[in-house]
Amino acid sequence: MDYLNLDEIGLIAPSVLTQTQSEHLSHIYKHIPTTDVMDILGENGWYPTKVMQSATNSGGESRIPYKKHIVRFRNDENDNIAKEIGDTFPEIVLTNSHNGTSSFKFHVGLFRLVCSNGLVIADQTFNQYKIRHKGFEKSAVIDAINEVTTNIPMVVGKVQQMMGKIMTPTQQKSFAQQAVVDRWGEDRWVDIDDVLGVRRAADKGTDLWTVFNRVQENMLQGGIITSTTDSVGRIKLNRTRKVKSIDENIRVNKMLWSLSEAMI
């Protein structure tokens, strides 16, 4: 596995490398560089594989160093687990920002190699672990790592259960329809065939795990046909866009995991 170095990370998500806090924050806020946490993860065998930061909107260029960012970490010791669940690797997913809007949050993640899907496990399966910007101890990061590591076998077991549950076409549509309601509400028509669309031969399966991954990828990558009706009855067709918001990406992932877990 080729891990990301700091130069590569800086090109994609410069906020990860920020060493100072935003000027508008009070003295109560204690700046903790994301790289300090990454160093501790590295000492424990977890290295960065993928990064992303929020898009620039209000505040312009001056806000870029403090944007919310997400870093996914993988440990080579878990590679054997990937063989048990179809080339899907357990991960630690770390989110943070340096603008005072977010603490460090550790999530359990899964990375599916065949489609480069990055999943995030719902809170009822693994409650996210937080470290606030008011004080920092190395032991807190190690506790978070241990919490994730302890829960990996349980998460793998859930995936194996999903892989073993075969879904009828009716069940697949019901799953997709509920996902649509949870994602967009009940006021928008959405093409369910697009939501369930198969993007590659490896995703033609009818087990819950494969269906879950198809829906997740289609919702996050965009391209699903939808329509809305205005106040005078005019219908407007649209295609969904790729999800670029870190918070929305995690929300959709956790929503779909919860929906899938309920169907086991």
Regions found by a protein language model. Give the residues of each.
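Intrinsically disordered, low-complexity regulatory segments
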Residues: 1-35, 39, 43, 53, ...
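Sequence-level detector for tyrosine residue identity
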Residues: 3, 29, 47, 66, ...
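A broad "ordered helical/assembly scaffold" signature
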Residues: 24-26, 49, 144-145
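Amphipathic, interaction-prone secondary-structure segments
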Residues: 31-104
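Intrinsically disordered, low-complexity regions enriched in serine/threonine
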Residues: 76-264
